[in-house]
Amino acid sequence: MSGNTFGKLFTVTTFGESHGAALGCIIDGCPPGLELSEEDMQRDLDRRKPGTSRHTTQRREADEVRILSGVFEGKTTGTPIGLIIENTDQRSKDYSRIAAQFRPAHADYTYHHKYGARDYRGGGRSSARETAMRVAAGAVARKFLEQRLGIKVRGYLSQLGPIKTDKLDWEQVHQNPFFCPDADKVSEMEAYMDALRKEGDSIGARINVVAEGVPPGLGEPIFDRLDADLAHALMSINAVKGVEIGAGFDCIEQKGTEHRDEMTPEGFLSNNAGGVLGGISSGQPIVASIALKPTSSLRLPGKGIDVDGNPVEVITTGRHDPCVGIRATPIAEAMMAIVLMDHYLRHRGQNGDVEVTTPVLGQL
Amino acid sequence: MSGNTFGKLFTVTTFGESHGAALGCIIDGCPPGLELSEEDMQRDLDRRKPGTSRHTTQRREADEVRILSGVFEGKTTGTPIGLIIENTDQRSKDYSRIAAQFRPAHADYTYHHKYGARDYRGGGRSSARETAMRVAAGAVARKFLEQRLGIKVRGYLSQLGPIKTDKLDWEQVHQNPFFCPDADKVSEMEAYMDALRKEGDSIGARINVVAEGVPPGLGEPIFDRLDADLAHALMSINAVKGVEIGAGFDCIEQKGTEHRDEMTPEGFLSNNAGGVLGGISSGQPIVASIALKPTSSLRLPGKGIDVDGNPVEVITTGRHDPCVGIRATPIAEAMMAIVLMDHYLRHRGQNGDVEVTTPVLGQL
Amino acid sequence: MSGNTFGKLFTVTTFGESHGAALGCIIDGCPPGLELSEEDMQRDLDRRKPGTSRHTTQRREADEVRILSGVFEGKTTGTPIGLIIENTDQRSKDYSRIAAQFRPAHADYTYHHKYGARDYRGGGRSSARETAMRVAAGAVARKFLEQRLGIKVRGYLSQLGPIKTDKLDWEQVHQNPFFCPDADKVSEMEAYMDALRKEGDSIGARINVVAEGVPPGLGEPIFDRLDADLAHALMSINAVKGVEIGAGFDCIEQKGTEHRDEMTPEGFLSNNAGGVLGGISSGQPIVASIALKPTSSLRLPGKGIDVDGNPVEVITTGRHDPCVGIRATPIAEAMMAIVLMDHYLRHRGQNGDVEVTTPVLGQL
Amino acid sequence: MSGNTFGKLFTVTTFGESHGAALGCIIDGCPPGLELSEEDMQRDLDRRKPGTSRHTTQRREADEVRILSGVFEGKTTGTPIGLIIENTDQRSKDYSRIAAQFRPAHADYTYHHKYGARDYRGGGRSSARETAMRVAAGAVARKFLEQRLGIKVRGYLSQLGPIKTDKLDWEQVHQNPFFCPDADKVSEMEAYMDALRKEGDSIGARINVVAEGVPPGLGEPIFDRLDADLAHALMSINAVKGVEIGAGFDCIEQKGTEHRDEMTPEGFLSNNAGGVLGGISSGQPIVASIALKPTSSLRLPGKGIDVDGNPVEVITTGRHDPCVGIRATPIAEAMMAIVLMDHYLRHRGQNGDVEVTTPVLGQL
């Protein structure tokens, strides 16, 4: 499989650069009969794009998705679904200077070494623009998971720089521009962000994604374990530098007696496993957490080099987002949904005949 | 691809349960001309197996690997390499009790829900035994990477429970049973482990893996980014619950000006990226870190349920390893080597190095 | 991999139904630096579409392809290439009758059994319209093969119903509407077709595709042999019912001494192998031949059934093409080019030709 | 995917050369609960190996298969099934002369150009020995298909050189050494073979494979159509040079009114489609036919060249089989079974929820 296709049975193949004519993707393997419309995807796309908070009336990036195939009379046909988002916000800028530079902590240098050249306009394929299609594709998966299986996938910001959230109130998540589930932290986050914006610097973030209602049995050991595929999917998001499942790095200092999630007829007594045991879903909520690095597109000068190896000072002008990590929330939800969709189809196929009478444990 | 095959061009497919007749694997895509013998793999296998420390003369699990194909006159032919390890240490035990139980924090429950049954002897396919083949396959990759490309992949224990290592001295790593690179911490670790063993409890660990000498340009955006594939490979190891690249979760609280690795003609000024930028290797050392959960095979009783849903008290008898995480070091090295090998071939071709002087025949 | 993606390193993923909004595809894995424009693809598309012969000035299906990504400043960047063809010739017809019918020898019945429903407008995804994208993608492969490797892929009609061609003159192939390489047979074919058109019946055809200049060594035994992948690619074209390589079915009655292509320092003495030996290219021209079945879209009534199982008489109205097989010529060329491209990259790497002089940075 | 793995959900990965230590394979994706033992596979293997006819008491190649994993208490567990056949009939011969030669119509030349070297003992990986594992893996698929779905896959010789069979009596197929279904042709075939053996020459053959009881709906358009995957699987068998489905190459001269399989409430009126329509199974018997080339291992001298390009005369000594094509019958059955198994699992997964009330047509 090429690097731009994800999944085995439910596959998502994307194309598009930040300044190309359009972004698009092909979703293959969506079962027939699912009601689907542009609205299903537009909702999630709107959450992702910049300007939703401080500039709610302005739409700088239209991000309007169009369905080109695979849907007939409002339902999926089982044939591939083609999606497209035309790039409208393409300002013609003078990029000639950037063309010859490698900005520190950007993919310029590595893309150049891989391809021998690069589309330097705004980051090209390495730009976060391509994630728009992942969100669109993820919306299809989320709809199927929710409607057919009652699986709910939701994410939230659990940490912005030094500020950690203490409470998890799902209702709060969409009430503020941070996907923050803790109302008490919002103003602190706003102040922090304003300060950063003034400084011209940026900060990282931590996002949690939770999938509830996942039936036990999903995952294909030993290499396509559910947690391994989730790690792959989440680490493939721009700016992600770490992935944890359940207790994650806290496991290091946990005793075995602490860590193990004991089982009673009423349910599991804890969820340090994060919903995945032996690489297979246990029926418990699947809990993943990712670390996003701070953006490197800063107006504060940084040391870079040009294509001939000479030192240059690099400054990024234009719109400045002090914490791009926040915007990863819908993308992380989308990737988790896509992985679960793929695994559901793989399992349902390979073990559809298996009848298990052993009770499924809930959680106390 | 099925769940038991890893990789795109350099693929590893494994089989085998802890108490089956044998473990085995097929390595496909190894370029021709690489000198290879059982010794190359045995070395890494010996490092992995239990008893290397306190019982260096005893070999409870022989773990002797045999090459069945793909090597001729001491060199790989380019055809698939079949490897086998016959299971010799199969004690006939009375497993009937375990058969009907789901041990907490083991894969019993999830395997049962997936397959409707399971080979309950010692964990079956979910047991860590299968990792022996990964180490064997990884040895092939490591040899190629080192001989052909000068790439060195090495791992070490960076944290055992609460004990963190301060120094990194590669020479120390194989001088103690912990893969500990800091001589000053070894006795502390030994004492800690002895205490745990007496308690009957277990603890987690953190392993770091480093690949040096990796050329820039490896990785296939956007889904098969090098870091995404590494995360996949490492998370697929039993007991891994978290993966970080470079600064990892420390990124959350890093400012952009701190995080970015500035570039000068003499080189990069730091390596928070961990050697991967935009999903592609930058030429810097690739640094990954994983969290291993504490083993759940304890003699301290835990609450489980049986196949009918009744509560049972579960005790694991037999050999007790208080920190299985340590043993993941060679496995993590193996997985990183396999990923790099696969990506190298994707970038440069499986036979790109083959030089054939035999004339090409035209047609009369 | 899903059913709508072809290839391992050079992959083509398509979407689109005959009456959907658009057809499209994503080409992933095209190496960077190849000059590419819409014209390169339009040329091959124009050869494929109906109306090129008797109605050369009319364009009923515009089939105008647009490049949406992956090309910058006239050259491929190595990132995915998105292509789109908007469907313009969508007559709003009354399909309600057809919706409930299964036409004999059409995919209606099988699509219904697979998906539980189908887009019945004009054949939906099973229509030959989707092959337009294959031709567009194939044009990219053909350009690379020709420019970089000097490989030429060309096809021609070798038999139309009972009329076999005797001579192979490449110059003739594009001088007539049949892709016929034998000028002496053209008027016979025209007369035959006119008679069929009057009858309202149809006939099959045989197409040969030849690739010259292919270096030896392409093909991945044992399952992805070059000939096996070619057979897959060609059999996947609508209406193909048979594939032969080299002497093909003539081998059955050939003696071993006849069949074998002897070798001398000057070259091979024959090419019964068709350029593939042991599943790997030999350097000889690769010769494949396919059988196309006659179209089933006839105005002559045929027996079908409706969705409830009742007998119906089926008549197809509208444009009638007595030999759709002819139109498979550019599609067969495209598929062969795509297979060769994929195998070349597997053998030699996706970026093996990229030369980067920019210095590699070390670490301070 | 590498070249030595076949399939998407039910995958078969093989290794082994004719003179290596062993042949083996890993079957991944077999659902749990299928009763399986070595006998199931040994039966099909015994049919394949040489010496079954004239030397029924001699076993020159033992071909004893052993199950190493994936089966517990007589049933598959859903985990990978490892199979092994130790190579016992390895005569130590003097191959030094052959090492430097390229025998005409053998894979020597192409393997050399691909890998830069080759295991020249008896053909190495290009030898037909590797097909033994395909037969073993195919036996697993056939058992599942038959037991779970009532699908029967059977093959027979339909033509040996110039001798065509007229009748199809399944009972006859295993009563003679030719897999010939027409008792009246057996002595003619024996005489023909004896003559060939005296001449020292060889001849080709045609094998037909039929799958009955296949439910409609299997196949994944557009690239993984069932017929395309079958063509791939069958063309991957050594010596196959052509594949047809249904009417195959006869389609060329068939009128549309002749070719189409009309449908009535009682069933299809014909089966020119060969059981596949639009790339999806129709419920009709799937009928494929393959052409096998004559073996090139002859004692009659042929012109070859050596590694330096000098002309040499090549003679093959040792056991001589005038028609290797015959032996392809169990291999063709195995490949068809593997393809159907894979597609069943892919379909059952992606469309397991689809309920179709439209009646399934049988055949008149």
From Swiss-Prot, chains A, B, C, D:
One of its GO terms (cellular component) is cytosol. NADP(+) binds at residues 48, 54. Its EC number is 4.2.3.5. Reduced FMN (FMNH(2)). Its cofactor is FMNH2. It catalyses: 5-O-(1-carboxyvinyl)-3-phosphoshikimate = chorismate + phosphate. The keyword Amino-acid biosynthesis applies. InterPro entries: Chorismate_synth, Chorismate_synth_AroC_sf, Chorismate_synthase_CS. Keywords: Amino-acid biosynthesis, Aromatic amino acid biosynthesis, FAD, Flavoprotein, FMN, Lyase, NADP. FMN binds at residues 125-127, 238-239, 278, 293-297, 319. The keyword Cytoplasm does not apply. Pathway: Metabolic intermediate biosynthesis; chorismate biosynthesis; chorismate from D-erythrose 4-phosphate and phosphoenolpyruvate: step 7/7. CDD domains: Chorismate_synthase (cd07304). Belongs to the chorismate synthase family. This reaction introduces a second double bond into the aromatic ring system. Homotetramer. PANTHER family: CHORISMATE SYNTHASE. This is Chorismate synthase. It comes from Marinobacter nauticus (strain ATCC 700491 / DSM 11845 / VT8) (Marinobacter aquaeolei).
